[in-house]
Each structure stands twice: as C-alpha cells, then as structure tokens.
Amino acid sequence: MLALIQRVKEARVEVATVVVGAIEQGLLVFLGIEREDTHADADRLLKRVLAYRVFADAEDKMNLSVQDMNGGVLVVSQFTLAATTDKGLRPGFSSAKAPEEAKVLYQYFLDSACANYHKVAAGEFGADMQVSLINDGPVTFLLRS
C-alpha cells in the first residue's frame, strides 16, 4: 500500500462539479492499493500518515505531525500509484488490487482514519475526480506500508 502525502494549505476534491471533500491546512493523501495489500498494511500505513512529521515547529524544523497541528486529512484513491513503470512507455497496472477488492480496503483505511482522527475528508473511490490544492513547500513524501 502506498500513500503519496502532500503538505497543503488547502485541498478539495470534486466529482461532477460537486465538492465531495475539502480541508484547510493539512495533508492530501493519494492512496494506492497493491494486489497483496491487507488490513494490516492499511493499519500500518494509516499510523504512519497520521504521525509523520512534516509540519514545522517553533524552530522551523519538521517536527509536527498533522495531528500535532490539528490539520485536515484528505484521502483520495489513486490506483495509478501502483503502476509498473520500469519498462516501456506505457504504465502497467497488474500490480494494483482489483477494483472491487481495492474499494473494500480503501473504505477500511478511510473508516479507520475517521475512527482515529477527527478531521478526515475523502474523495469518491473509482470516480473521475478533480483535485485542487495549494501545496505548502512543496513537501511531498511517498510512504509504503
């Protein structure tokens, strides 16, 4: 399981021109689910996402997590993160979990996030989404479960 996290000043996701999720300062989390991923992977990755220190403290060092600074978390499913890109000129998606199974694991991750943190918003799994954000930094990290 992969989480591409971006520190943002704000972010929102729309489906068919309707805003389905939005946050102010916090983390935008693009979540990629691979074929072998399990609930345990989701638990491990969520713990890291919520505790990963990417926000500046009083000394301007990255010492604060999204929880420490009471920021928002916007979770967006993105199967393209699981793509194989090492050969050729077209991505392959055989390493991504099948959509039906991925949706269940995505929902588990999202439900766990909501149960463990109070400022969680989300996109819509499998939808054609438009994601708008203002990067802060930019600061972007790829986390693996």
Residue ranges and their predicted role:
Residues 125-145:
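C-terminal or internal capping secondary-structure element at the end of a domain, subdomain, or sheet
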Residues 62, 119-130:
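Short, surface-exposed recognition loops or helix-turn segments adjacent to catalytic cores
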